[in-house]
């Protein structure tokens, strides 16, 4: 009886699960960052999404970054899954803050609320917005 080798995706998933299996500390150490993670689903029209995102949304957020108290922003586009398929997610924005208190203060600002309200103008596939704590 021959056994088939696990797929690359299964191996990557196992490696990630092993590497990430440590629970996050209850009390964050000094300097541990917090973030708002915005996960964008596939939009109905990617060209329209990209145009609005680059020309309107990102500049809108950037114009309020100081008010919001952002320390770092990373924008990621997902062209494919690891096995070459079209992913359910299209983009991700990782918006970092120096502490949980700074995050809570930032998301309460008029600038953050304006950027959040702007999502309806281009994120036609829907979004998921999460709060995350950096654990490494």
Please name every model-derived segment.
Residues 7-14:
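Sec-dependent N-terminal signal peptides
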